[in-house]
């Protein structure tokens, strides 16, 4: 496909953006337009994060359980979502878009607030969960960057893209998932809820799609620092 004919839906869930984000988005929009991309921006907000993400796909609960993104009325090639606290460059955004040529689902990496981990889980290690009460996030100092594209079980949706046809194959509402139940060694039943991004990644896997991260595509993650 000629990239100069691609229509990219850029989802910006949220209602407050930093000056850095606005600068980065403005520069990216100029560069995307210059390169011939058609950009459709979807800015939506809800206090319930799952609804924010659903709204950026043009979803409406009144259309029922069999609905598809944008009611099937928007001809697009890539749906790409950027969280309001992500710091990115135009070339990173373009690389993420172009990666969808090779991978139906692809994401960049960004650090969590502890600075020691990425918002990514390589695999759902149940034994680790039983011991720690959480799954094991990828460590920054252990990332193998010689493997540019890596399959993961989960990556946060802060800088994330899907080729058209992927989400259409999921079951609405996409961002919810059944409770996860795990039996501990002492027989106790552990019950865990999925966040909306974990739910989305699990739904992708259930539909036969791998989540791939570009390990060279590391973006910033703005957080408040109290001094």
What are the residue ranges of the model-derived segments?
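Short, conserved alpha-helix that lines the donor NDP-sugar binding/gating region
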Residues: 49-72, 202
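Short, high-confidence coil segments that cap the C-terminus of an alpha-helix
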Residues: 76, 102-103, 209
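Conserved catalytic core of nucleotide-sugar-dependent glycosyltransferases
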Residues: 89-182
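Short beta-strand-to-loop acidic/aromatic patch adjacent to the donor-nucleotide binding site
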Residues: 66-87
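Residues at alpha-helix caps and immediate loop-helix transition turns in enzyme cores, especially N-
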Residues: 21, 52, 92-93
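Alpha-helical elements of Rossmann-like donor-binding domains used by nucleotide-donor carbohydrate transfer enzymes
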Residues: 24-27, 55, 95, 199
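C-terminal catalytic/acceptor-binding lobe
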Residues: 3-5, 20, 169-227
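N-proximal low-complexity "stem/linker" segments adjacent to membrane-targeting elements
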Residues: 1-47
């Amino acid at each position: 496909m000629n990239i100069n004919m691609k229509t990219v839906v850029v989802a910006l869930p949220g209602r407050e953006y930093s000056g850095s984000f606005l600068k980065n988005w403005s520069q990216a929009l100029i560069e995307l337009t210059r390169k011939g991309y058609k950009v459709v921006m979807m800015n939506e907000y809800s206090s319930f994060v799952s609804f924010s993400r659903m709204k950026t796909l043009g979803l409406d609960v009144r259309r029922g359980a069999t609905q598809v993104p944008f009611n099937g009325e928007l001809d697009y090639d890539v749906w790409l979502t950027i969280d309001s606290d992500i710091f990115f460059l135009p070339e990173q955004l373009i690389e993420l878009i172009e990666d969808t040529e090779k991978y139906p689902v692809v994401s960049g990496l960004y650090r969590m607030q502890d600075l020691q981990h990425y918002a990514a889980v390589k695999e759902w290690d149940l034994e680790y969960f039983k011991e720690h009460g959480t799954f094991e996030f990828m460590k920054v100092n252990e990332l193998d960057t010689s493997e540019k594209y890596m399959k993961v079980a989960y990556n946060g949706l802060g800088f994330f893209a899907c080729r058209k046809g992927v989400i259409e194959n999921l079951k609405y509402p996409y961002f919810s998932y059944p409770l996860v139940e795990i039996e501990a060694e002492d027989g106790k039943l552990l019950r865990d809820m999925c966040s909306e991004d974990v739910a989305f990644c699990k739904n992708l896997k259930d539909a036969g799609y791998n989540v791939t991260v570009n390990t060279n595509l590391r973006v910033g993650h703005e957080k408040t620092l109290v001094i």
